[in-house]
Structure formats: C-alpha cells, structure tokens
Swiss-Prot record:
This is Small ribosomal subunit protein mS41. InterPro entries: Ribosomal_mS41, SAM_Ribosomal_mS41. The keyword Ribonucleoprotein applies. One of its GO terms (cellular component) is ribosome. The gene is FYV4. It comes from the Eukaryota. Pfam families: SAM_Ribosomal_mS41.
Amino acid sequence: MLFRRLFSSSVIVQAASKTSLRKTVKPSEEIPDVNAFLGRIGRKCDEFTDTYENKWDNLFTWGGPVLKEKGIPIQQRRYILNQVEKLRKGEEIKEIKKGKKSFFGGERKRKETIAKWRAEQRNAE
C-alpha cells in the first residue's frame, strides 16, 4: 500500500503543479528592480532592499522561512509575499494602506464601547 502511494501519479502531478505556480516574472519598465518594487508597494518595505541584495530572483524564490531568517518582521513579510504573488498573477502593484481603528475601537468591542460612551454622555448632562 505504501509502495503504491509513493509511485502514484498524483504525487508527480502535485509536484509539477507547484513548480509551475512559482514562476519568476521578468522586470518591467515600471518595476525594473527590487528596490523599485519595494518602494512601489510602500509600508517602508524599501528598507529591506539590502536584505534582498537587489536581486530579482531572490524576490521570487525566497519564502517566509528565509525572510524570517533574514530578520524581516512578520507583518512586512506577509505583505511583501502577498505583493509578490500579485506581481506573479499580473495584477496591478500599488500600496495598500494599513487599516485604522475607529474612535470606538475594533469591531468586537464596538457595541460595548459605544454603550459606555453614551451612558457617560447621559450622566454628564
């Protein structure tokens, strides 16, 4: 049973499909190098140009564990990898601004916070 599983065609198909998804895109006029890409996506990612050694292949071959070894924080890592995937798919590359909490806090505690605020307003009158 184990022998049959090791040599089944599904394992070969899975390996082939993963390699085809990991294609390297050629630099364009808009984004000629890694520095331009990291500057274009924003969120102070251009600080990591030295980490990538300004090599285009490093941008597409390095994954999360490698970037973690290089000392890139998790939020930046996820953002960069997300933008690299968008570049692979041919989507437009632009900065995605960080979200901002509302005055009343996050969505889980918003109702509670609004109720307390309204109670304080009533008591102040």
